[in-house]
């Protein structure tokens, strides 16, 4: 709460100190005789008194202290309102005089402390006042205090806490100006001080005794003594202030008596406020301050704390106290002047020494010692001080003094040499500050009148209208606009006079020429569309707000122009003259440029200018026309038309003598044209200037005709020629310099070629020839392509002409037929002759006109076709067109016969014409459809072959076979399913609908998958005639027509993963082999979609529409977002971190840090009991120190001291240097230029400016010098660097001295100063050009090689026939696998990545492996595509768009550098450093750079076209960024996957061959054992051999086997036994026949070979879990031992009973297998695929299967080309061969 608010709350509102006391009584009636203070106060009590009601106690100073102290004399902290007991006063005082006239309700002598008065102090020593009579008695100097009741702290200091939370208390010094307390800065303040006397109005009667009685003194029960004017003061405060008694009293005292007592003036303010060097002096001053403030009475602890302050803090308090004294004295003098207006003989001189007074500012301005900060303070004072202050400044000639400084700046700017940047910027800053001050001055009447009274003020402002600083020009425009409006036209005249004065002084021709010129240059400096493109240097350096500033400047300029033109309201001719002067300066061009800002305020001003112009010209013409003599009309319609103006003048002067002079003047004007070029322009300019003088003679002060003609024409022409000559000389010098630079560059180039020698030059020329050869080949290819495109366009044009003629002829014949029908109908109905005329027939169209127009169009088309045919070659018309031509243009005989026949048909049967009409329409539609639907052009010039393209033809027998096979493989579709074709696909159908067909669908799906993976697929049908239909599958009956080529939407996507099995994923799975980890738990035939989950619980089935997408995986267990800990921590509040108190015992040296994680909330942890107080911690540390623990810790864990390198003399010198640039930039300088660290800064700068090779070849240095912080100079760095720099763009820059020595700067700052700062105007372009000389060749090699590689790879993709065949094979097999609604004509390259995702039923072989195996075994001629497109692997990570951007950047960089050399920053070497060789170095390389840029452009265009074409060729979207980026990557991934599949397949085949060899060896051993058993009448027992096989399998697997694996192995054992012992077609009881082994081996060998070979398309992967097949890599002695054990067992078991049981068990097993097979056909279980009946009666033999499908055997031939019938019988125990009987490989007929 502010202090005034507190005072009002505590006293004014509650006690008799309030304002409302006696408010209703007049001032004179408020005091009666007995209550008058004249009778109460001593005679001297009125000295220096002031009105309390109209005074302003504003001498409030705040002193901020940094400690919680109580500075009062009493030991009170807050000040409960108490009264001092009378016993505390000294004994020589008078007793109080009672006052009885006050009302008792308001005279409470003592108020009880309210709660608001307690605890207000910041200190915590006590709360209630402690009264010490003895102390008061010692400190009391006078008997009675006057004024209000003294506060508890009588030293005059009020303590108030800061609202901002600072630590120290704020002590407010309240003192009335003029009182001793105010003078000394020591007064009192209590809660009752701020009252009615705070009114700011001053009392007129300052010496009145009545007025000295404020509301503070009315209720006081104390009487003032002679020595006090307000209140008691401590006796110890008289060392710094003297108190004087008033010399006069009474109401009639003179003004002199009101002069305040003189105070000891401080002679040197700066010295008085400067801190002493000796801290002991500061301590002494602080002791004095403590005595002065009464702080000695503070408690002992507070005094000790204050005495322990550091010297800096003590000086802060002393400095604040002294500052308060000075400000109080200054305000006292100011108030005295405002009150009494005394100005002794030395008043003005005294005020000139007062800092902040108007006279002081004027003195500083006149001495030219005023600083920018003081100018800014003056500007603020002129805006905020009272009017009297501003008036005093004007009367002290302040405005003229400011103007003189402004004139000096402008004179230096115009006539003097170009100043260095620091001084120039300083002058511009001062100019801006002065203009701000002048604007503030003229914002009132005194300043504006003074400006009109002194012409030099306006002249100075007009001169600043041409200032380089945009802010200054804007302010001056505003001030001049105001002056034009001031004093009813006088200001406008003064401004025009000042403009003419400046024009003559600067040697300009026109009044507004210089001004309009700089306005136009400023507006032209704005970049295009407000950007930095094409912007001027001023606009670029202006920062973010430059656009707004520029628009505001344009607004100010337009307002000033309108004010200058429109100010003379009653003088039309003067307005037109001023406007004409503006128009001659190009104001119309300027207005059109300003309109480009699109700023509403500017547009309004422009519209205002144009409207007033039109109105004035209209008034002028009306006046002139009304004044013509003899009613001769001389009216001018357009003032911009010289003919009308001349006619008007001639008509007005006709018949007068003036007409002769006018004619003579025109004739002389006509003679000017004989002069050439610039002379004529200058002549007209001179004539215009002279005519303006003549026309406005004596209309303006300086436009006197005699004065204007006192010059020679030659002198004027000489002055007019100067500009053109200078411009011409400048252009010539610039051209000559560029020629010289080019010659030097050519010389250096020749020198470099000579240095290369013969070998180097030959090598370089050979390289260039190779590049040129490549470019020529590239251009030749492009020309061939363009020729082919041109031929295509020509052919299409001819085709279009034929189509148009065809349609026109068809339409013509249709209309003629319709007309014939109408005529025949008219004849039948016996209509009149008029109605039969086709011209009178009614209809929508006028048929006769239409027929005529069509005939003309046909003739025109025929002529056009013939003419174009001569140029492009004649194309034969189509048959239909030729027929129509013959029909319309044939011989007369056939045509007449044809028409007669048609007429007979129409007359007999009108319907016949309809048939003929229909025929024509059908033919037209067919032909049009044929020609419009063709993308190729072979059919256009032959007969229509649309019938050939409707449906591909094939052999009926082959079609029947294929249809039967497809019908067998495609799932059956019910009638209900046929109705749902438009509904979602089967993956999107509900699970309930799919569950109804679960059995049948499961069987069919299984069969289809098995066929796709195991059985050889049928060969693709022969491709149809049309390439667009090659991908269509043979349609099932009834065959629908195939889709037309190119019709419809995009081709269907590649086969997605099959849908989840019916019934969802949560059902109980049938007993398939255990899936590998990561698969589904459902039936294995459909492979899992990507991202599937394994194990229960399975995810829910995908929703409709998203079945094929990848479901987002749920978060894994354990990563649930927001657990108990997160909730717990969130529920806790923010921990309150207590600041730990540092112990006084600290290690002597730095120790290693112990990094730990702090507990956030120690209140609820074990550390809550460890929280000790600071005293306890201190004791703990003391105890640890006594025990030696801390010393041991300090000894063991001492941190290693880091040595500071460079801490010697060099570092000290560096510290002495001044650093301006940032630390980061300085460090970057040291890093980049580390190689040159041993050289001085001047040498490094010389090498950089000379463009030495060691600089240009150092990439680190070049990259650093091109960085943004080197090219862009921050504003603060620019200001600090300016005094050290030199402007190389100015004249004679080499001899210009720097303001400050650059050796004061650090080494890095000096390098920055000499290079990037001084050459900043062309540094960026310079470094870009130099970097180009070193980078254009390697960049060209790098980028062009990539461009050529992209073109080469794209062409290899386009030319690779093998790749297209492989993709076609993939498409055919995919369509074979897919349903009818998923057939595709092509697929995108992204589908290739999914080939490896489609796996077989055992998740072992992928579709990619299958395709690779088919191509390698069946189509080996296609395998070379991997070498043909191998380049895609090297380009898979290449971003083609980024490559194109790099190439464009390369080309644009060379173009930009060339533009800079031609007409940019590098075009004018005059602006360069004198030793800079950038132009010579750059010119040498630009010829080769331009040539390489042109070649790069050709390579880029070729690459872009080839790449886009190859993307379109492969069906990709060349406008999609993702597709462009991943095109090569997709093919590279497919190629890498192909190679992996090839390696995998070869490894599997090799493993299978080794396995077969091992098993063949085992089978021979088993055959020997069986033969021995037969010789000994001991047949082999199936159970015994099965036990041995089971034992061997268990030994290999070493793990328990699943039931289905045991079943498969059991069936394999039975199969093996039948292959060895049982012949095909024999009965089981004939096992012991002699021919059994031989016959069985032969027949079974065929079937087994078939089975083995047919499994070629799905090789097995070895499973280590127990279902793996035995391979030869395992120890073969196990097989040998097993064979020997089998022989022993056969020898030991010759029991016939066992033979019988073995036969019965075999029969039982066969019976069970048949039963399982029958059940499997209806149940759809997995075992139905693995069980095959062995009865030769029910199953077809393998030979039947081979004869049924001869094509399939070609796909499953052995890899080595062996005859399968020659192979011996084999036993394959691999997972696919052993699990699947041989009859499963036969084609299914179900």
Curated annotation (Swiss-Prot):
Composition bias type Basic and acidic residues, residue spans: 24-35, 328-341, 975-986, 1694-1710
Source taxon at top rank: Eukaryota
GO biological process: actin filament bundle assembly; mitotic actomyosin contractile ring assembly
Domain GBD/FH3, chain residue ranges per copy: 274-702
One Pfam family here: Drf_GBD
Gene3D superfamilies: 6.10.30.50, Formin, FH2 domain (1.20.58.2220), Formin, FH3 diaphanous domain (1.10.238.150), Leucine-rich Repeat Variant (1.25.10.10)
The keyword Nucleotide-binding is assigned to this record: no
Domain FH1 positions: 955-1136
Pro residues bias locations: 1015-1026, 1033-1118
Ranges of residues in domain FH2: 1141-1564
Biased composition (Low complexity): 39-62, 187-203
Listed PROSITE patterns: DAD, FH2, GBD_FH3
Entry coiled-coil feature ranges: 724-811, 1435-1566
Residue ranges of domain DAD in the record: 1581-1613
Biased composition (Basic residues): 1608-1620
Keywords: Cell cycle, Cell division, Coiled coil
InterPro entries documented for this protein: Actin_filament_regulator (IPR051661), ARM-like (IPR011989), ARM-type_fold (IPR016024), DAD_dom (IPR014767), FH2_Formin (IPR015425), FH2_Formin_sf (IPR042201), FH3_dom (IPR010472), GBD/FH3_dom (IPR014768)
Chain intervals with Polar residues compositional bias: 205-236, 1644-1661, 1720-1746
GO cellular component terms, A-Z: mating projection tip; mitotic actomyosin contractile ring
Region ranges (Disordered): 1-275, 328-350, 975-1119, 1465-1484, 1596-1790
Domain notes: The DAD domain regulates activation via by an autoinhibitory interaction with the GBD/FH3 domain. This autoinhibition is released upon competitive binding of an activated GTPase. The release of DAD allows the FH2 domain to then nucleate and elongate nonbranched actin filaments.
UniProt record similarity statement: Belongs to the formin homology family. BNI1 subfamily.
Function: Involved in cytokinesis. Overexpression results in growth inhibition.
This protein's name: Cytokinesis protein sepA
Organism the protein comes from: Emericella nidulans (strain FGSC A4 / ATCC 38163 / CBS 112.46 / NRRL 194 / M139) (Aspergillus nidulans)
Taxonomic classification: Eukaryota, Fungi, Dikarya, Ascomycota, Pezizomycotina
